[in-house]
């Protein structure tokens, strides 16, 4: 029996407030913006929020990063902006909570598998052992999975549907060999192609490889990372129309329900936000993330939740701009 609320690991301290609007990426502010959006849409009651988790100390980051980088970042040294974001002490403090949030969500999914565990965070999957990259400071998913493997002996798979390849796990394997046990080779999955073929790539991996690995005991938990920048109108992504983006969500959450039945118990599942930029309309990013959770509530938890997706067409200058925008709006103003 599944718990009917999404367990959410959110502490306001994981949000960058000061100077947040000067950054190109709004990821440091996204947790707060999403919580506010969910409340505005009357959906926040479906989320059980806890801030009862400890911030990470420097030693936690050393699981996947060099001492030099960790020390340099928290002191505001030369590599403190290698992530492409502005640095200040409050931002440095906030990443202690974002990384602790994803770890806490994954660990909770294992200890309380009836709860869908949610970390409203991003800014992890491009970081490398000796520096940040691509708006990512520390490789939180690599740190979390190594800690979970060391503490609980559990092995995970990441379904990374961000608009960009999640390199941090692969780039950390040589630096931290325990990661090869925590997330085996081939289980940091990033779909290829676009639209229907992108969707099919996800389905083939999940049904053809991941499912058998779970049933055989090779994989213990799954982390779902459905980045909004894999949407076609994100300026830093391109893979999926609204239809195929939401089809991925619908497939995943219905598959989790199917796996619960095959296992005879809840499959440990956690999720995080990952990318999404839309400098012209950030509500479109928040709406995509919300639609993903609506599919979770409907497909997995069997709740009758009403929500109409609000993805606006990106204004593009060139051939057929006006006609494309109008037809795109008709196609994508849909209830999910």
Identify the residue ranges that each predicted region occupies:
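Glycine-/proline-rich flexible loop or hinge segments
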Residues: 15-21, 55-59, 78-91
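Charged, often glycine-rich, active-site loop that binds/positions anionic groups
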Residues: 53-78
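Short, flexible active-site-adjacent loop segments at beta-strand->alpha-helix junctions, enriched
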Residues: 12-14, 67, 123-124
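Generic alpha-helix structural propensity
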Residues: 29, 33, 56, 65-68, ...
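N-terminal low-complexity, Ser/Thr- and acidic-residue-enriched intrinsically disordered segments
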Residues: 1-56
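Short coil/turn linker and secondary-structure boundary residues
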Residues: 29, 52-56, 64-65, 197, ...
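Extended, charge-rich C-terminal regions with high alpha-helical propensity
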Residues: 37-38, 62, 222
